Amino acid sequence: MKTPEAILTQTVEQLEKMNETLGALRRELLPGQPRKFAILAESPLEEIRRLQIEAEQLTAAIVATVPA
């Protein structure tokens, strides 16, 4: 079973990849094709939001296990 720290590391790596994907779309499609960019950016943006929530939850879980 993976530790919360290992899962958080993986989540952060996935966030970085999604940000790179979004940046590549931006470089490829903007400013020339803003509508196409908006459509294609939806999925990476949703995934980024999901991963951010996951990272917040994992961070809270890690902090909760640290003795005061």
Spell out what each predicted region is.
Residues 10, 17-20, 24, 50, ...:
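Residues on one face of amphipathic alpha-helical coiled coils
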Residues 16-41:
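Short E/K-rich amphipathic alpha-helical oligomerization segments
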Residues 34-64:
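Short, charge-rich amphipathic interface segments used for partner binding and complex assembly
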Residues 66-68:
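Domain-scale macromolecular recognition modules
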